[in-house]
């Protein structure tokens, strides 16, 4: 196979070599002037082109541009704190989550929701969540009694995936579609998920649903499991979850548990917190302020 010979006399850089056995030295400018023909089957052709682009006009390697550090999940330990002393039950968090993550409007399908938990003197916690709290709760004074028992406490309690350190959902998935990342967030691989629903049954917090036919996830897949991901596409680019961003009273706090100055670390130092269903040993990464107990 013959190769084209570049005449040094036509080389605009005058880069001919004195070695009679070697061809002319080709500079970046010469190559770009002649045009580079890409050969798809040639291994490393992309690397070669990148290398040429890094050359200076005289053929010398220039100083490369600094490369931005990529997100390292192993460097983070994301956590979440809900301050029920602050929550006003407005439902903006639910709306923001649905819009950000393409969650169906039907309250049966939700990544986060808000409950009103009314505790009575007999120790019973009564829970209601009309439309998942998406449109807030009816204004007016709190009830003084429920079922003949005096009301001792009323509070709004946002709910979401607990991002458990010992998640029961991952172990039951028959195809490994639900998994835990190095930074502690539970995700669903939509390419693997077969929509069997085992993870929904295994989750003790009711934090999952199957995307119904006719609706889509951000990637456009119906019939797969979906759940809160702390808005993983946002937090891995330095932004806060949509629900945290929109909360008007700062009831939702998010941050890195490895950082003692993060909002969650500060909140957990300054106020007593509980995790839901602690007796199950799931070790949730979501903690609650202002709650002495929880609904059964």
Language model region names:
Residues 1-12:
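N-terminal acidic, proline/glycine-rich, low-complexity intrinsically disordered segments
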Residues 23-32, 87, 93, 199, ...:
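Twin-arginine (Tat) signal peptide motif
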Residues 13-39:
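N-terminal secretory signal peptides and thylakoid transit peptides that target proteins
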Residues 52-68, 100-149, 179-192, 207-227, ...:
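Non-heme iron-sulfur electron-transfer modules
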Residues 90-92, 96-100:
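Hydrophobic alpha-helical membrane-insertion signals
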Residues 236-238, 242-296:
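Long, compositionally biased charged/polar accessory segments in the mid-to-C-terminal portions
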Residues 19-25, 45-89, 279-281, 287, ...:
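C-terminal segment of N-terminal export signals and the immediately downstream linker at the start
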């Amino acid at each position: 196979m013959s190769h084209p010979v570049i005449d040094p006399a036509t080389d605009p850089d005058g880069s001919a070599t004195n070695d009679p056995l070697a061809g002319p030295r080709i500079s970046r400018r010469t190559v770009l002037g002649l045009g580079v023909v890409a050969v798809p089957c040639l291994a490393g052709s992309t690397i070669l082109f990148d290398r040429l682009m890094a050359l200076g006009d005289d053929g010398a390697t220039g100083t490369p541009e600094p490369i931005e550090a990529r997100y390292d999940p192993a460097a983070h330990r994301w956590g979440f704190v809900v301050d029920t002393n602050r929550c006003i039950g407005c439902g903006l968090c639910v709306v923001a989550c649905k819009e950000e993550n393409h969650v169906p409007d039907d309250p049966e399908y939700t990544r986060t929701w808000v409950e009103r938990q009314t505790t009575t003197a007999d120790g019973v916690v009564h829970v209601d969540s009309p439309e998942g709290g998406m449109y807030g709760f009816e204004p007016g004074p709190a009830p003084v009694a429920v079922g003949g028992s005096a009301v001792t406490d009323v509070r709004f309690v946002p709910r979401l995936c607990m991002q458990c350190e010992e998640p029961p959902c991952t172990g039951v998935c028959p195809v490994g579609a639900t998994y835990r990342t190095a930074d502690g967030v539970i995700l669903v691989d939509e390419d693997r998920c077969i929509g069997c629903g085992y993870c929904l049954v295994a989750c003790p917090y009711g934090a999952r649903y199957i995307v119904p036919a006719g609706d889509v996830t951000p990637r456009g897949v119906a019939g797969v499991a979906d759940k809160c991901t702390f808005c993983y596409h946002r937090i891995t680019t330095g932004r806060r979850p949509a629900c945290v961003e929109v909360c008007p009273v700062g009831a939702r706090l998010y941050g890195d548990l490895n950082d003692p100055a993060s909002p969650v670390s500060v909140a957990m130092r300054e106020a007593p917190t509980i995790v839901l269903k602690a007796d199950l040993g799931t070790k949730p990464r979501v903690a609650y302020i202002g709650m002495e107990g929880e609904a059964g």
